[in-house]
Amino acid sequence: MTIEKPKISVAFICLGNFCRSPMAEAIFKHEVEKANLENRFNKIDSFGTSNYHVGESPDHRTVSICKQHGVKINHKGKQIKTKHFDEYDYIIGMDESNINNLKKIQPEGSKAKVCLFGDWNTNDGTVQTIIEDPWYGDIQDFEYNFKQITYFSKQFLKKEL
């Protein structure tokens, strides 16, 4: 008899839900699909800690990089709410500022594990642990974010499923 593992829900977080977290959501979904693991997830989503870009499509550079790599991205910005801490198993931030903001609003006793996406870095020198905000940077910064997020997504799937 095979025991079926419970499905999990994952939310990716950045400041505005405009550059990094929508990219993370899209890449993670892409990697889940490639690995044929859709049946292991209830929800995969992304949010911002702020309301700067609620209802907006992601930054055009995020969309461009995803499309160049064959990753579908279709998202409108949303802000994380306290209720989400009981709807998701993992709430994953891109940098320390995201984690600090999340911990300020996380209700005591909620089920979500708040963690840094870089926690899945194997520290073998492939990528840096912190996914820096590319907002003020150029397209190479978005490309590097793509590399980091792809790497962390693959590591998450290896270690958590």
Curated annotation (Swiss-Prot):
GO molecular function, one term: acid phosphatase activity
Database matches in Pfam families: LMWPc
Keyword Methyltransferase: no
InterPro entries referenced in this protein's UniProt entry, alphabetically: LMW_PTPase, Ptyr_pPase, Ptyr_pPase_sf, Tyr_phospatase_low_mol_wt
Site, Important for catalytic activity: residue positions: 21
Active site: 14 (nucleophile), 20 (transition state stabilizer), 133 (proton donor)
Subcellular location: Cytoplasm
Lyase recorded as keyword: no
Covalent S-S links between cysteines: none
Enzyme type, top EC level: hydrolase
Catalytic activity: O-phospho-L-tyrosyl-[protein] + H2O = L-tyrosyl-[protein] + phosphate; a phosphate monoester + H2O = an alcohol + phosphate
Main location: cytoplasm
PANTHER family membership: LOW MOLECULAR WEIGHT PHOSPHOTYROSINE PROTEIN PHOSPHATASE, LOW MOLECULAR WEIGHT PROTEIN TYROSINE PHOSPHATASE
The protein's name in its UniProt record: Low molecular weight phosphotyrosine protein phosphatase
Native source organism of the sequence: Saccharomyces cerevisiae (strain ATCC 204508 / S288c)
Protein's gene: LTP1
